[in-house]
């Protein structure tokens, strides 16, 4: 959305290739469990808040799970997920979900 994807990926490829590789494997699969994880992030946020620790990190994570759940991937399953999607393809789906 901000036009920084290729520059960011180039930096990761140079400085943190293992992280980029992990992102390529994991980010496309996040929507498969996002609905469940959204609730879990709110539960953790509430626990942290009750303990007097900031809940904002996990509230933000819940927001990301909500966004992931709006992508078409969220309607797939572990058995039917399209494994050929690139990280860029998936990020485009996230951007489109923001627009909704």
Regions found by a protein language model. Give the residues of each.
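Helical "substrate-binding/catalytic lid" subdomain
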Residues: 1-83
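Short, basic/aromatic-enriched C-terminal tail that caps enzymatic domains
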Residues: 80-100
């Amino acid at each position: 959305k901000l036009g920084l994807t290729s520059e960011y990926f180039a930096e990761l490829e140079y400085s943190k290739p293992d992280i980029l590789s992990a992102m390529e494997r994991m980010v496309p699969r996040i929507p498969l469990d996002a609905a469940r994880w959204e609730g879990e992030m709110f539960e953790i946020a509430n626990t942290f808040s009750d303990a007097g620790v900031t809940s904002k990190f996990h509230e933000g994570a819940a927001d990301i799970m909500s966004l992931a759940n709006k992508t078409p991937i969220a309607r797939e399953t572990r058995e039917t997920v399209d494994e050929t999607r690139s990280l860029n393809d998936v990020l485009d789906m996230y951007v489109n979900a923001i627009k909704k």
